[in-house]
Amino acid sequence: MFFRASFFLFGLVWITMAQLLAQDEKEKTTALKDLLSRIDLDELMKKDEPPLDFPETLDGFEYAFNEQGQLRHTKTGEPFVFNYKEDLHRWNQKRYEALGEIITKYVYERLEKDCNLKKEILPVDATEDEPKSFIYVSEDALSNPDKIMVLIQGSGVVRAGQWARRLIINEDLNSGTQIPFINRAKEEGYGVIVLNPNENSLEVEKVSDPAKKASPDASDEPAEKRERKEERENKKKKDFYEKYRNPQKEREMEHIPIRENGSPEEHTLYAWDYFISKSLAKNIFIVAHSYGGLSFVNLMINREAEVKSRVRAVAMTDSVHNVWHQEASKSIQDWLREHCCNWVSSPEPLDTLVDPMLNDCPRVSAGTEKHELTSWKSFQSIFKFFSNALKDHEDDSSSSPVTTRSSHRIKHEDF
């Protein structure tokens, strides 16, 4: 009997202790979850991070382009190294972006000094104080009576004269910039217009407004009590974060849209209205990479008659346009099928026909599986395509006043 009672008491104590331990573990788990929920992982990555102060010139980075147009370290001769500091991905990314801004300015210099292009400010009637964008044009872009070539890049950080920043930094200037296209076009008698579809806004530092208060309806608490509560919470957060990081405060920025150029589509339309369409050239040719293809289709939807009357051919490279989503009319789809060719990323040899995704623009292989390389890899084929398109148009114009649908059909066997 005594043994049973003792066993019962022991069991009761054991269960109670287990419950207490479980409760203690549960409380610890809850506390840990609460702790983790308040830790900003991005902030933790800033721990012991070096200052985000980077050089403003290529010389400062100790890099330069060699005779082959490759970016190399001036002391070691090595290519660019992204992981300059191990386990500091955010810092390395910021360093890469800082170098990218320098590259953008470098390409602008090459466009002006080597390609003899001049900058045209947008909007054309911009006031001194409003945000502005720009494009680059050759001296004869508006006066060339024969033909002009228009270059439109994809979306993202790339600016006028660039196809892909990654290629410029890691490969060479030929593959990553539009300079080879510009030089070849000028050699063949084209005027040139280089668009800048991603320069859509002016970035300025955001100025905080201390007078800006929360809406009176946001809370039933008295304003004074709410402010004291927020102050206490903010102090707690600050004290908490200080344990985990060496803070680097980044400036908070805001973007002021550029009038009538607030998106790639707007920019392309504006450039057409104020520059491309005002050119004296009878024949217009367009190279559009990635999102640039979508911007061109949008242009055609808005200026169909004008485009059809003057654009002889469009070379797209891995274009992301979609005639269904963009609601392009059947007449536009028919025109694209006759006057456009899309060089897409593919393992097939260059210029090999690729199954069409939609019944609008013929697709051929760019001879590479890398999206950003499609423009460079199809360089020779694009100029041949334009030459054939112009010859077909001139033959049709001289032989008959009536142009048949088949006369402009892309002859892939000619590539």
Swiss-Prot record:
The keyword Coiled coil does not apply. GO terms for cellular component: cytoplasm; nucleus. One of its GO terms (biological process) is regulatory ncRNA-mediated heterochromatin formation. It comes from the Eukaryota. Residues 204-242, 392-415 are annotated as: Disordered. Keywords: Cytoplasm, mRNA processing, mRNA splicing, Nucleus, Signal. The keyword Ribonucleoprotein does not apply. Residues 406-415 have a biased composition (Basic residues). Residues 204-215, 222-242 have a biased composition (Basic and acidic residues). It is found in: Nucleus; Cytoplasm. Coiled coil: none annotated. PANTHER family: COTRANSCRIPTIONAL REGULATOR FAM172A HOMOLOG, FAM172 FAMILY PROTEIN HOMOLOG CG10038. Belongs to the ARB2A family. May play role in the regulation of alternative splicing. May have hydrolase activity. This is Cotranscriptional regulator ARB2A homolog.
